[in-house]
Amino acid sequence: MPPHVTLVNPPSPSGCTGHWSITLLGLGYLAAVLEKNRYEVDVIDCQALNISFEEVKNELRKRQPDVIGLTSTTLTYKSALHIIKIAKEVCPNCLTVIGGSHVTFWDDKALQECPQLDIVVRKEGENTLLELMQKLEAGKSFGDVLGITCRKDGKIVKNPDRPYIEDLDSLPFPARHLWPLDQIRKIEDIFYLTTSRGCTFWCEFCAAVRMFGRRFRMRRPKNVVDELEYLHNTYGATNFTFCDDAFTVDQSRTEELCEEIMKRKLKIKWNCGTRIDMLTKELLIKMKEAGCISVWSGVESGAQQILDAMKKGISVEQTIRVFGWLRELGLKTAPNVILGFPGETKKTAWKTITFVEKISPDYVGFYNIATPFPGTPMYDYIMEKGWLRVTDFDKYDTATPIFETPMLSMKELKEIREQAFHHFYLRPTYILRMFAKGGMHGLSATRTALEHLLKSIKLKLQRL
């Protein structure tokens, strides 16, 4: 009888916002590949449904899977290990497997820290997990499976990496039917897709190159629009987010994708994330015609010296120009910003805050605190300098300072971030613009402004 697999998305620490919608893609692809090969698969998504550890334990006791597979970010790492320990209590003979960006670069430590963990899957997991299932079903050893780290004769063994999947079109669409979509869509009625993997850039704060390789592997436009059309026809979906790190990396492919959407007369709205230097006004016009309503981008900093230190490869001038196009075309904007990168000072941080106000986005995607995630060049640099102050991964939420430099303390950075949000949302121009849009926009702007006003007053009182 084929092995039964339960895939688990562990909960985020209390008070943290989970990225369950993105995680659905990772686990969804794994589940789809296993289902295609006739394995029984089910899912426990703790973040999507706010499931407790006790509920996970009860579900695993009831389901009794042969294999329990978890995904893990840095933020959910401790939760994932706790679930593995729970799993072995109620399913003592199950095989426990974990994958994801964090454990890819923390594989040996994960096995050391959790005796109940059997196997770490590094990097892309679809073909690796499938081979593990095939070996288990055939009663064969896992010893020669590429892309895993495991124990052998009491020692931790790291097998060679598995080659990346070259033809992403060969992957089935994520098995979204395994999720309670009716409940999820009450929270957020957006369907997420990814159209590429890998990256050719080497930003210091990002692990994409080490995780997925230093080149872009892209799905063909027809395959992507096939998925859009399937979701539209099957679930009545009309709102989509493309989760690629750089959606417009290949302009001709993006144009072809837009043309395919229009050719099929799909009445949909979508947004995407991309790099500032991978946009032209002509491309944005085409994207809008095909249903694009907003673009989020990694602005990161308004100080050129910090952008250069990040190895971001963009200029402040490029950002100003592109945001001008976006505003002119009526496309909503949401820049992601990083504060506290090594080399940051109070002066450069405030330069970024005033720069964000200058480009006048509709929303601030995030004022992220620079966080040294394992696997990133920044993590290596911070460790080399001895600047790391927080080792509890539950705090790696990009809202909490993790390290400090001689130029900026953790306390100073936390205060600057709080002031940045207050500064942005208390601007009269922002409030007036939201009121001009009318309806819920005006009410939301008022509520947001009042929240930040109260926080700003509280912050000032604390300093007295």
Regions found by a protein language model. Name each.
Residues 1-7, 40, 57, 66, ...:
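Radical SAM enzyme core and accessory elements
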Residues 64-68, 237, 361-362:
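Proline-aspartate-enriched helix->loop->beta-strand connector
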Residues 109-127, 289-296, 351-366:
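Structural recognition of alpha->loop->beta junctions
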Residues 169, 173-341, 346, 351-354:
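Radical SAM [4Fe-4S] cluster-binding motif and immediate context
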Residues 14-27:
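Glycine- and acidic-residue-enriched helix-capping/strand-helix junction motifs
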Residues 14-16, 107, 201, 251-252, ...:
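Flexible glycine/acidic-rich beta-alpha junction loops that bind and position SAM and/or redox cofactors
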Residues 2-3, 11-14, 145, 150-195:
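N-terminal [4Fe-4S]-dependent radical SAM core
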Residues 4, 20, 33-167, 368-375:
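Glycine-rich beta-alpha loop elements in corrinoid/cobalamin-binding modules
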